[in-house]
Amino acid sequence: MADPQTRADYRYFLPITTRWMDNDLYGHVNNVTYYSYFDTVANHFLITEGGLDIHTGPVIGLVVESACSYRAPVAYPDELSAGLRVDKLGNRSVTYGIAIFRDGQVTDDPAVAQGHFVHVFVDRADRRAVAIPDQVRAALQRLVVAP
């Protein structure tokens, strides 16, 4: 498991409001819900900052790999923030580092969960890999962190 990440390790943040339905029988947010949070922050960034048109644009991003390490439980009604960065920016794909933080934490408090997503950009019609659109690439470039 990678070392715990802090907010300082991320470049973009999105508030996440937990919902009653996110909790499972054990009284904490269920593991699958974290992937929804990951997907939400990545796509929010692509749409709002990169101009990706998910409804009619010729290019879309598909998740081809994901992982998550859980470090501390959260539960409704916790308020969270999802942190996003770019760990690797290729010609047709991007690897995001993503972490979830409990709001109210200080800057150096560790993430409650952290992981990654790999998006491959494809032609909407035939699903073949294509180059990341220039506007999207420019936005992603702002999130790149040094290895």
Language-model features: locations:
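Hot-dog-fold acyl-thioester-processing enzymes
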Residues: A2-V64, D123-P147
